[in-house]
Amino acid sequence: APPMSSAMANVDLKRLDRAFAARVAAYPPFASQRNFGACALELCYTAAGYFDLYLHGGQKPWDYAAGSLILAEAGGNLCGFEHDDYWTSPAWHRSVIAALDPVLFAQWRDWVRENRKK
């Protein structure tokens, strides 16, 4: 796995609370950030390895249903801000922390959860 400091992240800053979004923008643990605005496509790009990290603060079922399944089938890792089991997170408004690589995923999940609390 590449170090998180050289990772490409897909982060939807406008779906994060203001303080956390400011922290992600000002002190990113990754090298570069993108956002395309199409959640299913972004999750598929993560599954394909185009993005190393993925973060979204709240998706609706039509946003995440197909893309999260494709990422999971590709061997990717997903969880929510509060729940380790992504599939039992609240269905109507689901946060997503994801990565294809399990080592990067663990680092990213821990960073997100720690920094959301500040």
Where are these regions (language model features)?
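An extended, acidic
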Residues: 1-118
